[in-house]
A protein has these predicted regions:
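Conserved catalytic or metal-liganding residues and their short signature motifs at active sites
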Residues: 1-174
């Protein structure tokens, strides 16, 4: 996790390490104890100590974050916190941040519209602020000219369509 020290890392990895002394030697030679990075790493059974150290030094791999329509922004923050490094309070603060809302023309009531339900590839330790920005980019990709035209054809706004979709999903899930 973010803020871990070398002993924390050893505690997490100890079930995978056959020779702890050898692992410490390799880690020291590569300068790992003084350069620990948070992230999501893939450690496979049978990897040797050098491969493990290389994986945790250089191998932060993306994770897939999934969420569906949420009725409340607090629910979304909780879902994200279960999948990523930051806690739900940090996500919630970022989603309600006035600068974020103003930057993208949102209000506290419409902030949830920035988050289009889907699966997204992000780094496990992405900051809530960077996650918000990524979701805004994804929202812009989703709301292309064709979709915006369709909302106008049925006399609805993007916000109304998103709200309606959330209601439909909630009702069909019953």
């Amino acid at each position: 996790s973010t803020g871990a020290n070398f002993n924390d890392v050893l505690g997490e990895l100890s079930p995978l390490i056959k020779d702890l002394e050898s692992f410490n030697t390799v880690a020291d030679k590569k300068g790992y104890p003084s350069n620990i990075k948070a992230g999501h790493f893939i450690i496979n059974k049978g990897m040797n100590n050098n491969e493990i150290v290389n994986a945790i030094r250089n191998g932060n791999v993306p994770v897939i974050v999934k969420f569906n329509n949420q009725e409340r922004i607090e629910n979304l923050a909780g879902s994200l916190a279960n999948q990523l490094d930051a806690d739900s309070i940090s996500f919630l603060k970022a989603m309600r941040n006035e600068q974020f809302l103003n930057k993208y023309g949102l209000t506290k009531e419409t902030a949830l519209c920035n988050f289009i339900p889907n699966s997204y590839e992000v780094y496990w330790n992405i900051s809530p602020e960077n996650f918000n920005d990524k979701m805004h980019e994804e929202s812009n990709k989703f709301w292309n000219d064709d979709r915006i035209k369709k909302t106008k054809n049925i006399n609805l706004t993007k916000t109304q369509v998103i709200s309606l979709a959330a209601i439909v999903q909630k009702e069909t899930a019953k």
